[in-house]
From Swiss-Prot:
Name the UniProt record assigns to this protein: Non-structural polyprotein pORF1
Task of the protein: Methyltransferase: Displays a capping enzyme activity. This function is necessary since all viral RNAs are synthesized in the cytoplasm, and host capping enzymes are restricted to the nucleus. The enzymatic reaction involves a covalent link between 7-methyl-GMP and the methyltransferase, whereas eukaryotic capping enzymes form a covalent complex only with GMP. Methyltransferase catalyzes transfer of a methyl group from S-adenosylmethionine to GTP and GDP to yield m(7)GTP or m(7)GDP. GDP is a better substrate than GTP. Y-domain: Indispensable for virus replication.
A molecular function (GO) term: ATP binding
Species: Hepatitis E virus genotype 3 (isolate Swine/United States/swUS1) (HEV-3)
Gene3D superfamilies: Leucine Aminopeptidase, subunit E, domain 1, P-loop containing nucleotide triphosphate hydrolases
Length: 1708
């Protein structure tokens, strides 16, 4: 637990300390983890190098080069994070398996040290293939790697990574290689020590030792145990100095990261490299001091150490700076060489004072000390000489200047003016020196080095020019020139959709800066005449519009355009935003798609783009396939005559209305600014600004679509034309190619009016969540598609050309293209089209469409998608159009995944669409079917599926055969090969023990191939010629072959036998153990075929009933003929055949076989032994557990000491605990109460039409006095902790706001914040931390009173019936037995009580904010205790129900109609209600004792009663970050909460009150109601109420409330409409559509109870709450609206009101 008891952190006194603490926490959270073991010196070096990064040392590994590798890993992480999917140059073998994001790796053939690296490379995964090719000299097995080197490889990739692999390549060579790869960015990590800039020698620094021999540089870091870096000095110098490459392949080189002398260089291809000077070593800790004489000695017979001595020595910066400061400031008399030597000796000692380093010191050699003293002395002497000379010469100059006369000064003033470029002292030049003089200096400081050198690339520019003139004579002859002098050119690949080597950039392309288009523009109608023709506007309207002009004021803001159009004396406003709904004159819906960045918008078959040009705003419009371009000049237009404007508007309105009444589909409603605006024909958010708001002329421009305005008389186009011509005021229609009344048919997946077409079936291949129609939200945010965790598709059939038929979701496909079932306008529709729009909204940009042929539209944004258009068979059956729909999708390269086009709302028969796909697809394509279509296909599919062996599969399988042939086991496979081709097969799949093997007859087969020797012997005993896979390679040629357990055979051997046999019949179970890659070479998964079962057998003759239930998740349709009910037993002596999971367990258990070897075998009795080494196998492979559990027919003993099978839900703990608690095998009556739906005999609900949701809730707020709350929740002050011990976290951070998706902003429930930490504390303390009032008294009196309701209970026995009901309830909740543990009370998990805050609040007619009540919580007992006590409590509850009088109703255990009849029969009674306050909190030792008394009556075991008393009397509630240790109380999550709360409620009512004319009583938890004529408090009530601290609130009235219903004597029970509607207002209907659908179904269930009593409910419920009947009437109508799926939701973000200033604690 993160909290400490009663700990208060010391306050932070200053803001500086708070900022420092936050900075320290942030540094630690982002620290670099150092894993190797380091010495003290290595640790100090690493800390200094990695500054300012924080380091965290967690030593766990030993490395040869710890310092370099830590730096390498840090820079590698940076490079890979920036590069994304990339090409890698010279990858280290150990990093191959850890980085699957690499597209291709370039290697060189290993020599020297690289051979050792390859030998130690991983032997599994992708690295195994690379390792095999490197060490054996084999060619690569795939395109993920090569051994051509970076310079000779031509794999196309946009981004590259080179980690310490470019030290042998010049920068110019790298530029040429990048161009060869088509690469634009390369992240290169290089080690560039500054010592390579110095002469040869040996250089000691604080971090490393560098030996420079003139040609090579060898670097070894502190503590290295093997050789270090060895690189060419000249290449390193080039990398240090070069910042750009010029020539044919220009580059810029930028240093983006540096740790010491380790750099990350970003090489970027740039057309014109600019100067990029940089300082490579600004944090260098050494200066290099030159030795004047250098190394001495001469070559001799014996090698001398002098030849390796350096001419420069690395001196710490602090030593040199302090020495120079000391010497330069000495007095002339005190300056001498001996004093300098004394000072240098002093500062070279390291001095520490405690943990503080006072002087860092310097451990130098004799040569270095001598060189430093010499250089320092001579340098200081030179500086002193300059000082002396400067002072003396300066004094003489001053004397001369001040001695000048007036004439000389006047001459200087006239002819020596300074000007702007005057710098004081610049004219003085007393001293000049040469570079080779001693006075030029003796040391080099890397901190001031600046480099900016450009290097030309090595392309043969001159030779290329010569070749262009003299070497291409063949071109003149018409032949192709293959001139060898041509340079390497960068690759320009395909756009990317069919080029496997192409990888797009992860960096968003730079978007062009768009000019602000705001301004005033003049629109002339004659500019848009081409648009009017495209829109099929009648001639007279087009003529009127051409004569008019309009002035448009455009205001642009991010993602929004506002237009104010002035047309004569009328003004219109429109607002362009993405997702705006456009008004239509038909049932078709139009949603505007607007992209401000692209400056485009579109809806339906209309789209436009706009651009600001010098001439004005240029708009390109595409409408119904025709294009129009107009340029609107800036400024205002002449005002049009009001009469002409009015005539134009009236004619346009009549045209829209006529189209609305007579067109089949309609189109856009054309407003005046839609024809005379700058964005025609769009007018989103149309508003007409009129001086008179009641002017009827407004109806000409503003309308709302309704079905009442749509004529149901749909006449054909031929009949519509005469009507149009005869309409008054309308012109004759124009004769365009496509008549305006016959618009394109609606989208295949769109919603269709229910009156015009029958309801369509659910669109094909979609889950229900996709088909949900939601209110139009903002356009969905584009998120990168995440692959599903596991595929659910099911292979149904494979064609000879490789095409496959699946049942499942189209989006699980790996094909290059996805085919969308679109509409002629390619607009976002419903169903599958809507699913495409949700995932890929960019795919519907009309500007990105590529029209190949017909109606199909191809798009590559954001991935390759084909929008295919099938015919609408509701309008016309057109088989040719259906064929063309599929044919138009074949103009592509690559494979495509199809749905069944047209089989959804367009109602094309499945068979026709399937046949069309079968005739018009390409090899390798995939077809995805819905479950109904899959059922049709299963009944009509071809007899035998086909398996296609491609060239790649054959090549990989032959490689596996070669590897097998080299082993002793696989000698029989020598010379065997697999060739590409097609294999037909029959595959019988079935559940374990279904008799697949027994169904094979000897006359039907020649050879049987089995995976194991055990199976081979079993088949041979039956008389079959059976062989293992390797041996069978000699006998399967041309034979009839049966392959048993086919999925477990090595796939290359499976393909070999299938191809060689004359006929092949496969047997197996796809859910059992597949083929295992024992070699870890990666070949098995690469060639594993997808086998489609031709038949499934679901009846097992082997598995007992309990095993079938365990494996039903894998086999939903499994049935058994076995009569054995229970066969699994735990921890009994081993019997029968022993089954283990690993080879180690097999060696430890003589006679055992592994599960893999037992696959396909049958035993009478088995023993499963699970050992600890099989944990990973069992958790990762469900197939191993299935095989182990399905080998026996009678009995299986499970020995699971480590608990491995229990972790995956295979345990008998529930059964053991049941029998331990005294349960017996037996039968009781089921606890399920039969319920039925009310018949519609009156149907009064039909008289309540759907009503407005907003008005209903507003009326409810007015009646109850509730108002919109400014806050989302209230955190009430935390009460004082009166008893117990509270553990709480130190930080009580809370969120400031809550996001809610609700029906209304007026909430009618007590507001709380369930997810807040302070709310959890308040609930814990307020509900369970109050002091319990103990009551010591005998229970006999209360039990005697309780006998009025519950007579004395006889012995009760918990049976397996209750156990079954308990398990059934757990399964319905999605639980398994893994959470039920063995009854070990020392284990905290057995008795843990988990607390969590409830998210639902209580409906109230009072105050919703200032109620001062704490929240509600659930304290859930452990599953172990629930399973232990649950069967007993269920049995006791059944016995109580059997003893109850008929007029006493308990909980929910009754039929509602019976309770209603009992209430209606008590017409002369009043309703007695009792409401408890703090019902759970006031339960104490007395209520617990009464529960134990009842348990004893029932014969429950004493140890179980005492355990229950112990758990209830002292407990710990465990919240996520808090816990409370307390006593007594009642927990809402106990297994018997409802039972014992109801019993305690009955006992209190029976003991405290006496009733006259008692008729009916109902009890449920703390809620109760009694129908009687009068009542009084009994004489014994005061003692019980005072002793237990009960808080009773009695209400006695004619009509009452109980458990969500209204109790009306004489009428019956009625649904509580007000309470239900109030609770709905508090629900969060988001964030997804699933939650909204659940609540909608709950509303439908509630309305079902109102079927016959709606009118009575209005009168009665209004009297209970004191509200008007009209409110209840409106609430019922509002519920009808919600049930119809037409609810309106509001998304609100409200603050949380925090009233908890402090948590009050009581210190014991």
């Amino acid at each position: 637990m993160e909290a400490q008891q009663f700990i208060k952190a010391p306050g932070i006194t200053t803001a500086i300390e708070q900022a420092a603490l936050a900075a320290a926490n942030s540094a630690l959270a982002n620290a670099v983890v150092v894993r190797p073991f380091l010495s003290r010196v290595q640790t100090e070096i690493l800390i200094n190098l990695m500054q300012p990064r924080q380091l965290v040392f967690r030593p766990e590994v030993l490395w040869n080069h710890p310092i370099q590798r830590v730096i390498h890993n840090e820079l590698e992480q940076y490079c890979r994070a920036r590069a994304g999917r990339c090409l890698e140059v010279g990858a280290h073998p150990r990093s191959i398996n850890d980085n699957p994001n690499v597209l291709h790796r370039c290697f060189l053939r290993p020599v020297g040290r690289d051979v050792q690296r390859w030998y130690s490379a991983p032997t599994r995964g992708p690295a195994a293939n690379c390792r095999r090719s490197a060490l054996r000299g084999l060619p690569p097995v795939d395109r993920t790697y090569c051994f051509d080197g970076f310079s000779r490889c031509a794999f196309a990739a946009e981004t590259g990574v080179a980690l310490y692999s470019l030290h042998d390549l010049w920068p110019a060579d790298v530029a040429e290689a990048m161009a060869r790869h088509g690469m634009t960015r390369l992240y290169a990590a290089l080690h560039l020590p500054p010592e390579v800039l110095l002469p040869p020698g040996t250089y000691h620094t604080t971090s490393y030792l560098l030996i420079h021999d003139g040609d090579r540089a060898v670097v070894t870091y502190e503590g290295d145990t093997s050789a270090g870096y060895n690189h060419d000095v000249s290449i390193l110098r080039a990398w240090i100095r070069t910042t750009k490459i010029v020539g044919d392949h220009p580059l810029v080189i930028e240093r983006v990261r540096a740790i010491g002398c380790h750099f990350v260089l970003l090489l970027t291809a740039a057309p014109e490299p600019s100067p990029m000077p940089y300082v490579p070593y600004p944090r260098s800790t050494e200066v290099y001091v030159r030795s004047i004489f250098g190394p001495g000695g001469s070559p001799s017979l014996f090698p001398s150490a002098c030849s390796t001595k350096s001419t420069f020595h690395a001196v710490p910066v602090h030593i040199w700076d302090r020495l120079m400061l000391f010497g330069a400031t000495l007095d002339d008399q005190a300056f001498c060489c001996s004093r300098l030597m004394t000072y240098l000796r002093g500062i070279s000692y390291k001095v520490t004072v405690g943990a503080l380093v006072a002087n860092e010191g310097w451990n130098a050699s004799e040569d270095a000390l001598t060189a430093v003293i010499t250089a320092a002395y001579l340098t200081i002497c030179h500086q002193r000489y300059l000082r002396t000379q400067a002072i003396s010469k300066g004094m003489r100059r001053l004397e001369v200047e001040h001695a000048q006369k007036f004439i000389t000064r006047l001459y200087s003033w006239l002819f020596e003016k300074s000007g702007r470029d005057y710098i004081p002292g610049r004219q003085l030049q007393f001293y000049a020196q040469c570079r080779r003089w001693l006075s030029a200096g003796f040391h080099l400081d890397p901190r001031v080095l600046v480099f900016d050198e450009s290097v030309p690339c090595r392309c043969r520019t001159f030779l290329k020019k010569v070749a262009g003139k003299f070497c291409c004579f063949m071109r003149w002859l018409g032949q192709e020139c293959t001139c060898f002098l041509e340079p390497a050119e960068g690759l320009v690949g395909d756009y990317g959709h069919d080029n496997e080597a192409y990888e797009g950039s992860e960096v968003d392309p730079a978007e062009p800066a768009h000019l602000d288009v705001s301004g005033t523009y003049a629109v002339h109608g004659r500019q848009l005449e081409a648009l009017y023709r495209a829109l099929n506007v009648p001639h007279d309207i087009a003529a009127r519009a051409s004569r008019l002009t309009a002035t448009v004021e455009l205001t642009a803001s991010p993602d929004r355009l506002e237009c104010r159009t002035v047309l004569g004396n009328k003004t219109f406003r429109t607002t362009v935003v993405d997702g705006a709904h456009l008004e239509a004159n038909g049932p078709e819906q139009y949603v505007l798609s607007f992209d401000a960045s692209r400056q485009s918008m579109g809806a339906g078959s209309h789209s436009l783009t706009y651009e600001l040009t010098p001439a004005g705003l240029q708009v390109r419009i595409s409408s119904n396939g025709l294009d129009c371009t107009a340029t609107f000049p800036p400024g205002g237009a002449p005002s049009a005559a009001p009469g002409e404007v009015a005539a134009f508007c009236s004619a346009l309105y009549r045209y829209n209305r006529f189209t609305q009444r007579h067109s089949l589909t309609g189109g856009l409603w054309l407003h005046p600014e839609g024809l005379l605006g700058i964005f025609p024909p769009f007018s989103p958010g149309h508003i007409w600004e009129s001086a008179n708001p009641f002017c009827g002329e407004g109806t000409l421009y503003t309308r709302t679509w309704s079905t009442s305005g749509f004529s149901s008389d749909f006449s054909p186009p031929e009949a519509a034309a005469p009507v149009l011509a005869a309409a008054p005021g309308l012109p004759h229609p124009t004769p365009p190619v496509s008549d305006i009344w016959v618009l394109p048919p609606p989208s295949e997946e769109s919603q269709v009016d229910a009156a015009s077409v029958p309801p369509a079936p659910e669109p094909a291949g979609l889950p229900s969540s996709i088909v949900l129609t939601l209110p139009p939200p903002l356009p969905p945010v584009r998120k990168p598609p995440t692959p599903p965790p596991s595929r659910t598709r099911r292979l149904l059939y494979t064609y000879p050309d490789g095409a496959k038929v699946y049942a499942g979701s189209l989006f699980e496909s790996d094909c290059n293209w996805l085919v969308n079932a679109s509409n002629p306008g390619h607009r976002p529709g419903g169903g599958l089209c809507h699913a495409f729009y949700q995932r890929f909204p960019e795919a519907f940009y009309p500007t990105e469409f590529i029209m190949r042929e017909g109606l199909a539209a191809y798009t590559l944004t954001p991935r390759p998608i084909i929008h295919a258009v099938a015919p609408d068979y509701r309008v016309e059956q057109n088989p040719k159009r259906l064929e063309a729909a599929y044919r138009e999708t074949c103009s592509r390269r690559g494979t495509a995944a199809y749905p069944l086009l047209g089989s959804g709302i367009y109602q094309v028969p499945v068979s026709l669409s399937f046949d069309a796909w079968e005739r018009n697809h390409r090899p390798g394509d995939e077809l995805y079917l819905t479950e109904p279509a899959a059922a049709w296909f299963e009944a009509n599919k071809p007899a035998q599926p086909a398996l296609t062996i491609t060239e790649d599969t054959a090549r990989t399988a032959n490689l596996a055969l070669e590897i097998d042939a080299a082993t002793d086991v696989g000698r029989a496979c020598a010379g065997c090969t697999i060739s590409p081709g097609i294999v037909h097969y029959q595959f019988t799949a079935g559940v374990p023990g279904s008799g697949k093997s027994r169904s094979i007859q000897q006359g039907d087969v020649d050879v049987v191939v089995v995976p194991t020797r055990e199976l081979r012997n079993s088949w041979r005993r039956r008389g079959f010629a059976a062989f293992t896979p390797h041996t069978a390679a000699r006998v399967t040629i041309g034979r009839r072959v049966v392959i048993d357990e086919a999925p477990s055979l090595p796939p290359h051997l499976l393909l070999l036998h299938m191809q060689r046999a004359s006929s092949v019949h496969l047997l197996g179970d796809p859910n059992q153990i597949p083929a295992i890659d024992f070699e870890h070479a990666g070949l098995v998964p690469a060639i594993r075929p997808e086998l489609a079962p031709t038949s499934w057998w679901h009846v097992t003759h082997r598995c007992p009933a309990d095993v079938c239930e365990l494996i039903r998740g894998a086999y939903p349709k499994i049935q058994t003929t076995s009569r054995v009910l229970r066969s699994l037993f735990w921890n009994e002596p081993a019997i029968g055949q022993k089954l283990v999971f690993t080879q180690a367990a097999k060696a430890a258990n003589p006679g055992a076989i592994t599960v893999h070897e037992a696959q396909g075998a049958t035993f009478t009795e088995t023993t499963i032994i699970a050992t600890a080494d099989a944990r990973g196998l069992i958790q990762s492979s469900r197939a191993h557990a299935i095989v182990a559990l399905t080998r026996h027919t009678e009995k299986c003993v499970i020995l699971d000491a480590p608990g491995l099978l229990r972790e995956v839900g295979i345990s008998d703990v529930i059964v053991n605990n049941f029998f331990l608690a005294g349960g017996e095998v037996g039968h009781h009556r089921p606890s399920v109460i039969p319920r039925g739906n009310p018949d519609q005999n009156l149907g009064t609900l039909q008289a309540f039409p759907p009503s407005c949701q907003i008005s209903a809730y507003h009326q409810l707020a007015e009646e109850l006095g509730h108002r919109p709350a400014p806050v989302a929740a209230v955190l009430p002050p935390c009460p004082e902790l009166e008893q117990g011990l509270l553990y709480m976290p130190q930080e009580l951070t809370v969120s400031d706001s809550v996001l809610v998706f609700e029906l209304t902003d007026i909430v009618h429930c007590r507001m709380a914040a369930p997810s807040q930490r302070k709310a959890v504390l308040s609930t814990l303390v307020g509900r369970y931390g109050r002091r319990t009032k103990l009551y010591e008294a005998a229970h006999s009196d209360v039990r005697e009173s309780l006998a009025r309701f519950i007579p004395t209970i006889g012995p009760v026995q918990a049976t397996t019936c209750e156990l079954y009901e308990l398990v059934e309830a757990m399964v319905e909740k999605g639980q398994d037995g893994s959470a039920v543990l063995e009854l070990d009370l020392c284990n905290r998990d057995v008795s843990r009580i988990t607390f969590f805050q409830k998210d639902c609040n209580k409906f109230t007619t009072g105050e919703t904010i200032a109620h001062g009540k704490v929240g509600q919580g659930i304290s859930a007992w452990s599953k172990t205790f629930c399973a232990l006590f649950g069967p007993w409590f269920r049995a006791i509850e059944k016995e109580i129900l059997a003893l109850l009088p008929p007029n006493i109703f308990y909980g929910d255990a009754y039929e509602e109609s019976v309770f209603a009849a009992a209430v209606s029969g008590a017409g002369s009674c009043m309703v007695f209600e009792n409401d408890f306050s703090e019902f759970d909190s006031t339960q104490n030792n007395f209520s617990l004792g009464l529960e134990c008394v009842v348990m004893e009556e029932c014969g429950m075991p004493q140890w179980l009663i005492r355990l229950y008393h112990l758990v209830r009397s002292a407990w710990i509630l465990q919240a996520p970050k808090e816990s409370l240790k307390g006593f007594w109380k009642k927990h809402s999550g106990e297994p018997g909460t409802l039972l014992w709360n109801t019993v305690w409620n009955m006992a209190i009512i029976a003991h405290c009150y006496e009733f006259r004319d008692f008729r009916v009583a109902a009890f449920k938890g703390d809620d109760s109601v009694v129908l009687c004529s009068d009542y009084r408090q009994s004489r014994n009530a005061a003692a019980l109420i005072a002793g237990c601290g009960l808080k009773l609130k009695v209400d006695y009235r004619p009509i009452g409330l109980y458990a969500g219903v209204v109790v009306a004597p004489g009428l019956g029970t009625l649904p509580d409409v007000v309470r239900f509607a109030g609770r709905l207002s508090e629900k969060n209907w988001g964030p997804g559509p699933e939650r909204a659908e659940q609540l909608r179904l709950a509303v439908c269930d509630f309305l079902r109870g109102l079927t016959n009593v709606a009118q009575v409910c209005v009168d009665v419920v209004s009297r209970v709450y004191g509200v008007s009947p009209g409110l209840v009437h409106n609430l019922i109508g509002m519920l009808q609206t919600i049930a119809d799926g037409k609810a309106h939701f509001t998304e609100t973000i409200k603050p949380v009101l925090d009233l908890t200033n402090s948590i009050i604690q009581r210190v014991e």
